[in-house]
Amino acid sequence: MPFRLLIPLGLVCVLLPLHHGAPGPDGTAPDPAHYRERVKAMFYHAYDSYLENAFPYDELRPLTCDGHDTWGSFSLTLIDALDTLLILGNTSEFQRVVEVLQDNVDFDIDVNASVFETNIRVVGGLLSAHLLSKKAGVEVEAGWPCSGPLLRMAEEAARKLLPAFQTPTGMPYGTVNLLHGVNPGETPVTCTAGIGTFIVEFATLSSLTGDPVFEDVARVALMRLWESRSDIGLVGNHIDVLTGKWVAQDAGIGAGVDSYFEYLVKGAILLQDKKLMAMFLEYNKAIRNYTHFDDWYLWVQMYKGTVSMPVFQSLEAYWPGLQSLIGDIDNAMRTFLNYYTVWKQFGGLPEFYNIPQGYTVEKREGYPLRPELIESAMYLYRATGDPTLLELGRDAVESIEKISKVECGFATIKDLRDHKLDNRMESFFLAETVKYLYLLFHPNNFIHNNGSTFDSVMTPHGECILGAGGYIFNTEAHPIDPAALHCCRRLKEEQWEVEDLIKEFYSLKQSRPKRAQRKTVRSGPWEPQSGPATLSSPANQPREKQPAQQRTPLLSCPSQPFTSKLALLGQVFLDSS
């Protein structure tokens, strides 16, 4: 189907008037401001606990009030939480953490790291924080956003991942040693998401640094997966990156595959890439034809389309949010409501849910405080204003606080049936879960900007428009400003093209009573606003790591020329025009 892609200046398809309340069980509507403050308190309880008990380890162990390294040795929770600090309005702590990361994070270490997790959490987190630095009052260097310490750190981390892509197929290994490259005995079997979840971060990095290698390897990996789809249009779960042969042939939208589909859509919007969107739409047809049953999505055999697992996985709950990005709101809401019934049954989403039996799957009863259903609620609420979506936000706050809160943060729920806890607080709780909850209850947050305000930044390559909205969240909820990808282009013609699009967009707004408020800022040193940090217990000095710490075993992935316009409301249009 022919279509046009529009750079979104709102988060999702169409921003309708928002409802500011949702009926609760007693008939009252939850107050967004009330829940916003409770979410903020949740963040600081977890964040302070990490700083006091776990930094500089990757993650907090909330039951024993200590830390451990998990996905590398990067102070991962601090990187993952950085942009959340700004979204919550804490510029002073953001500034302090930027300094701490520069002084303490080193990627020249003999560590086997997940290529997927390092990209989405470390590279994505550093890129997002880099692009938000000026807004947070950080004194940026001349040439920003095309240069800066966080950008250099992101580039260094990404270069450590490049050896993983040196395979006959161009599809990356799942694990790489940050000092030595791919280990000789490394398994060549990688999950689909571990291959197809790089285009957002790597294309951003190439655009900002001028080095095309990152975007190039990400595109090759995407295309190899596309070429490996079955005759009925489906992809499997795990593939051998040396031979290109599928090892696990289960096809679905959940664990091991999920963010591949997500990045086709988000990559298409971020890069205005018609081909990526066309690829997703073809997949979407096959997914609906073979895996979609009664607004659930099952797992099927990729070559035959026969059902292999009639289960719902909690990671699949991102799908309604993704559907909203392509304008498929009706289907998105129906599927969301199915998933919400599971939440209400258990007070969270179990990792696996047997749909015919209506109950959890053995050994998959846990809920590690995942964000996916809350993420979809945030997107859909921006698109529809349906009060049911606020109800989910309210229920999530109440459940997490009641079940998971402990003295040192929030603990993973090991079993939703009896609410037993596990001694882990994953970094995505601060990067994603809390962030999406806060944005659900904060419709006026700068992340939701619809283009009514923006900044004009002078770079060595000309004027650059930033902060107008349309942020693209990577799969770890790190927001990327799509306009930034046009700030550092070496070809002046590309800059003129962007400026023409900006002028055309704002000419559409001249008839509106409220004109765009524009402030001009120039790159270079400036004095940030002073003020006390709101953080009660900053960790200015990292604690020394103990050599006896046990690490969690590594996993490879988690269980132009075409019409281009700036959209007033932000939308991917699918039509015949």
UniProtKB/Swiss-Prot annotation:
GO cellular component term, pick one: endoplasmic reticulum quality control compartment
GO MF annotations in UniProt: calcium ion binding; mannosyl-oligosaccharide 1,2-alpha-mannosidase activity
Record's note on what induces expression: Up-regulated by the unfolded protein response (UPR) via the XBP1 transcription factor.
Keyword Signal: yes
Subcellular location: Endoplasmic reticulum lumen
Taxonomic superkingdom: Eukaryota
Gene3D superfamilies given in the database record: 1.50.10.10
Modifications the protein undergoes after translation, according to the UniProt entry: N-glycosylated.
Keywords: Endoplasmic reticulum, Glycoprotein, Signal, Unfolded protein response
Keyword Signal: yes
Biased composition (Polar residues): 531-540, 547-561
Record GO biological process: carbohydrate metabolic process; endoplasmic reticulum mannose trimming; ERAD pathway; mannoprotein catabolic process; positive regulation of retrograde protein transport, ER to cytosol; response to unfolded protein
Residues the record marks as carrying a glycan: 90, 112, 289, 450
Signal peptide: 1-21
Region (Disordered): 513-561
Family: Belongs to the glycosyl hydrolase 47 family.
Function: Involved in the endoplasmic reticulum-associated degradation (ERAD) pathway that targets misfolded glycoproteins for degradation in an N-glycan-dependent manner. May initiate ERAD by promoting the first mannose trimming step of ERAD substrates, from Man9GlcNAc2 to Man8GlcNAc2. Seems to recognize and bind to exposed hydrophobic regions in target proteins.
The protein's name: ER degradation-enhancing alpha-mannosidase-like protein 2
Species the sequence originates in: Mus musculus (Mouse)
Gene this chain is encoded by: Edem2
